[in-house]
């Protein structure tokens, strides 16, 4: 998967000055979290297979609905593991899967590796990256479709599926006997209004996935979760987890529980900063004749593309952007898109690096323009 091979972690952070490829807020130091934790007192045993009870209670408390309890939460080593567990526990070769594309690579590659029949519902710039719910639901085959996968807010476009539309998809999936997987990793980072309730509240066949990585800037504590109110489905996910990792890291889950216990203090300044960063990009885009995008509704990423009348060597653009300007973005092929598109991450760099990176985009585009 190129998104992993070409990730900034593998490329080397020391080769990048302005990192606009990241899909999370800035990484945080343990000392900055203000946690009152005594790591020396932790017993480094196998933990609760479902996850730390205090962490599960905190996740349930943030669900925005009374339908979700701590017993419905399965903690996993990152959201990627949760996505993997859903696919591997629910799919067999030949099973029909409907996936909204672009999507996180795990949601595409794992069903492919299993040998499932993957049907992609592609979003388009011309439609504002908006999900056509009727068209998506028309792809669901009663008795044949086993899994439907959506993301909201969406990565890499930042568009949001309205709660009423998520409910419609949940109904269609349930009527067909399919599981609905909703990746809600950016749920806490909406740009207008409060986050919606977890989609898992919509039915026992719905799984919500999220993590500490994107909104909290804590990818180093590998902590994600899957939320499901259906007992049978939840048991399948737990069994899959036990086969792969048994339980999570005692240290990681303890730290995550401490952060989520202070969620009401931790999140507001993060959300305010994300909106300030979006304003920087808004101002830059307002003066653009080279690039265009659909303004994201949530998250810290947007999918930018060259305007249709801009003649450019996109391979040269990405090459000189890094080599000459020290700036890195997520090229379109990470998301099975043309490299005339790229994911712009505005949540991770400093404000100064963000502004410098935006200027670098213009400079690199000028260098790569075709006659």
What are these model-predicted stretches?
Residues 320-328, 335-371:
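PLP-dependent enzyme catalytic core of the Aspartate aminotransferase-like
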């Amino acid at each position: 998967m190129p998104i992993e091979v070409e990730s900034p972690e593998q490329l080397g952070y020391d080769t990048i000055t302005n990192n606009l490829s990241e899909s999370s807020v800035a990484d945080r130091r343990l000392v900055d979290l203000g946690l009152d934790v005594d790591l020396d007192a932790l017993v480094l045993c196998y933990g609760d297979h479902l996850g730390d009870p205090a962490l599960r209670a905190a996740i349930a408390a943030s669900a925005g609905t009374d339908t979700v309890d701590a017993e419905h939460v399965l903690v996993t080593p990152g959201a990627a593991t949760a996505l993997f567990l859903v696919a591997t526990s629910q799919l067999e070769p030949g099973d029909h899967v409907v996936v909204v594309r672009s999507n996180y690579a795990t949601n595409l590659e794992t069903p492919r590796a299993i040998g499932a029949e993957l049907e992609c519902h592609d979003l388009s710039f011309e439609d504002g990256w908006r999900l056509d719910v009727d068209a998506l639901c028309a792809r669901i085959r009663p008795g044949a479709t086993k899994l439907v996968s959506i993301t909201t807010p969406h990565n890499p476009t930042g568009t949001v599926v309205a709660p009423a539309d998520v409910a419609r998809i949940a109904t269609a999936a349930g009527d067909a006997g399919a599981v609905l997987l909703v990746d809600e990793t950016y749920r806490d980072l909406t740009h207008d209004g409060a986050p919606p309730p977890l989609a898992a509240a919509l039915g026992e066949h719905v799984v919500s996935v999220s993590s500490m990585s994107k909104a909290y800037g804590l990818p180093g504590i590998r902590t994600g979760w899957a939320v499901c109110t259906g007992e049978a489905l939840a048991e399948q996910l737990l069994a899959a987890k036990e086969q792969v990792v048994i339980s999570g890291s005692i240290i990681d889950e303890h730290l995550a529980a401490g952060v989520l216990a202070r969620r009401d203090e931790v999140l507001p300044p993060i959300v305010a900063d994300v909106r300030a960063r979006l304003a920087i990009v808004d101002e830059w885009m307002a003066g653009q004749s080279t690039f265009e995008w659909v303004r994201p509704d949530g998250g810290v990423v947007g999918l930018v593309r060259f305007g249709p009348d801009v003649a450019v060597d996109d391979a040269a653009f990405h090459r000189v952007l890094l080599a000459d300007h020290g700036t890195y973005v997520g090229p379109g092929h990470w998301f099975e898109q043309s490299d005339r598109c790229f994911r712009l991450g505005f949540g991770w760099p400093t404000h100064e690096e963000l502004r410098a990176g935006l200027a670098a985009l213009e400079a690199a585009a000028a260098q790569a323009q075709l006659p």
